[in-house]
Amino acid sequence: MRTSHLLEQLMEALRCLPGVGPKSAQRMAFNLLQRNRQGGLQLADALNRAMTDIGHCRDCRTFTEDDICAVCANPRRQENGQICVVESPADIVAVESTGQFSGRYFVLMGHLSPLDGIGPSDIGLDTLEFRLQKETIAELILATNPTVEGEATAHYIAELCHEYGVPATRIAHGVPVGGELELVDGTTLSHSLAGRQKLNLY
């Protein structure tokens, strides 16, 4: 069956979203056209404005409509002296939800991956190195993902920190709260044993 050219374009555009295949894209397109044309127009307007107006923070590289994001512009965050390095803006949301961090961030927008041609400058490490040189940083917290690439990226940044005399720490990885030991994989358990802490009873 031959469908509308515009409809095919809409379905193809929807497929750029993660996890959306041909069937899902078709279902979304038909739903918008049949039941929610106003919602579709609002979606199109919001997407257009976001793609046009949202850029990157000059200091931390997260998404923002302004030159400097709200976190970097906050004087209390600046006085804290801590910078948490993460791989994506979504990681900032995760860290903020804990309520345990009150410093600033630096977003890599990825990780080192030589096989994919992604080097230090591709993830903003030249910008981070400049900040290590110029700013007084009390602690750089490395919160990259516990993957091979994430660990390699953390190690590379730790070496930069050592070069400029900036204390670097790595977030702990281990057995999840509520998890059962027998179900934990060997690598995670190894990290847990290596990063064990002394119990302070008093």
UniProtKB/Swiss-Prot annotation:
* Domain Toprim: from-to ranges: 81-176
Checking SMART domains in the record gives:
TOPRIM
Alphabetically ordered keywords of this record: DNA damage, DNA recombination, DNA repair, Metal-binding, Zinc, Zinc-finger
Its domain of life reads Bacteria
* CDD domains registered for this protein in UniProt: TOPRIM_recR
Q: Which PROSITE patterns match?
A: RECR, TOPRIM
Record flagged with keyword DNA repair: yes
| GO biological process terms on file | DNA recombination; DNA repair
Give the protein family: Belongs to the RecR family.
What is the role of this chain? May play a role in DNA repair. It seems to be involved in an RecBC-independent recombinational process of DNA repair. It may act with RecF and RecO.
Know the name of this protein? Recombination protein RecR
- Give the source species: Photobacterium profundum (strain SS9)
